[in-house]
């Protein structure tokens, strides 16, 4: 990646997305669409806007979640319960290719912004409804937040230590739903290019999380085995954990029997362990996990962390440092791959990391995070509202 690349020619240039969004699931989907070149207009409520704006004040007074998920967007702040505000957003959606919403169940329909109503006038529109639990079933009307969905799906039951179930350190259910929404929009745009047809797409956080639970679900279905919470270990692989060194610890993950042979022969100098009757195959090593882990830990304690890391790399055995966020910020891999960019905000420039999709000839957008309602006037003006009409709407509390 080179700083000399520009964002001209991104795949979704010319696509307009209107997103009635809050929190994480819809914002991460729309932000990635914007990264890829789409124009994304974020519709926010009067007053506080997206409530994620107020999660914390860690980034020069702005919320860390919000600056992460909302660069490259425009913000229009409208009272959707008012007739004028609702009409303005309906007019805005009429100019769009994609409409995304992740408000509470039934809210979009009550506002006249349901898929059926919108697509009756605009059949080419792609509508994405993002919910917690889907549009049917006993939980369909429940509000859903990431932790609740992680718990309801059983993700928490396999995450954490033997003593304590935990949620993941990032909002996994939100992110999963957002990425499936992103994929579905791209697929729908591709289909529309061929057929002219729009789409109505439902993406549930529950379903997205269940999709990620395939391995533990199959273990339960066909072996009647509940995956145990094992911290950094892996239920089906050994050795796979953080092991102590002379000055710290290092993660080692042996994925197959060849890796085991490389570990004990090339790293530890113990070739007799490669074909040991209790350790020769992964199934055997999992059965004797306690003995394997104790033996590996005894051998890793003979090395300094950096020396062991180098030796594992030379032998082709997968290993990693157990870094924290401070170490990540200084990680040489980010620097070597030129991943850092500057992103504008109302509080001044901040650092941001490029999206993970890397095109060789064009750079993903890294434009500013909008202030609340920053583009309200410009967007309303583009919809034919005069300056006088906009000022009247503002004085009436309809826009901000």
Give the ranges of each region predicted by the language model.
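N-terminal helix-loop segment corresponding to the beta1-alpha1 unit
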Residues: 1-194, 371, 377-400
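Glycine-rich beta-alpha junction loops
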Residues: 47, 132-134, 205-210, 247-249, ...
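Conserved PLP cofactor-binding pocket of PLP-dependent enzymes
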Residues: 313-334
């Amino acid at each position: 990646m080179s700083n000399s690349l520009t964002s001209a020619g991104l795949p979704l240039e010319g696509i307009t997305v209107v997103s009635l969004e809050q929190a994480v699931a819809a914002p991460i989907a729309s932000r990635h669409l914007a990264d890829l070149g789409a124009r994304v207009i974020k519709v926010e409520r009067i007053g506080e806007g997206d409530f994620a704006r107020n999660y914390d004040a860690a980034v020069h007074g702005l919320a860390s979640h919000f600056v992460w998920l909302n660069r490259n967007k425009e913000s229009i702040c409208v009272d959707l319960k008012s007739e004028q505000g609702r009409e303005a957003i309906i007019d805005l959606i009429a100019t769009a290719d994609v409409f995304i919403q992740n408000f509470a169940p039934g809210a979009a329909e009550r506002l006249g912004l349901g898929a059926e109503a919108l697509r009756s006038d605009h059949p080419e529109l792609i509508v994405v409804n993002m919910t917690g639990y889907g549009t049917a079933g006993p939980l369909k009307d429940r509000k859903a937040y990431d932790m609740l969905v992680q718990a309801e799906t059983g993700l928490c039951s396999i995450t954490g230590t033997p003593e304590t179930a935990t949620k993941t350190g990032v909002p996994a259910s939100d992110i999963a739903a957002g990425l499936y929404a992103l994929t579905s929009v791209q697929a729908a745009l591709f289909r529309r290019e061929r057929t002219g047809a729009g789409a109505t797409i439902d993406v549930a956080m529950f379903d997205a999380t269940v999709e990620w639970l395939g391995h533990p679900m199959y273990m339960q279905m066909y072996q009647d085995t509940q995956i145990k919470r094992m911290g950094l270990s892996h239920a089906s692989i050994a050795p796979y954990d953080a092991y102590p060194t002379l000055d710290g610890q290092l993660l080692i993950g042996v994925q197959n029997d060849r890796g085991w042979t490389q570990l004990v022969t090339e790293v530890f100098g113990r070739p007799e362990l490669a074909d040991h009757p209790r350790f020769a195959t992964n199934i055997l090593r999992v059965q004797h996990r306690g003995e394997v882990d104790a033996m590996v830990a005894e051998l890793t304690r003979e090395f300094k962390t950096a020396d062991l890391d180098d030796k594992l790399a030379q032998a082709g055995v997968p290993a990693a440092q157990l870094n924290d966020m401070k170490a990540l910020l200084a990680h040489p891999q980010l620097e070597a791959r030129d991943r850092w960019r500057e992103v504008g905000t109302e509080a001044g420039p901040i650092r941001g990391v490029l999206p993970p999709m890397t095109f060789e000839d064009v750079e993903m957008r890294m434009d500013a995070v909008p202030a609340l309602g920053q583009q309200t006037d410009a967007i309303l003006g583009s919809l034919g509202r005069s300056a006088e009409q906009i000022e009247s709407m503002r004085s009436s509390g309809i826009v901000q």
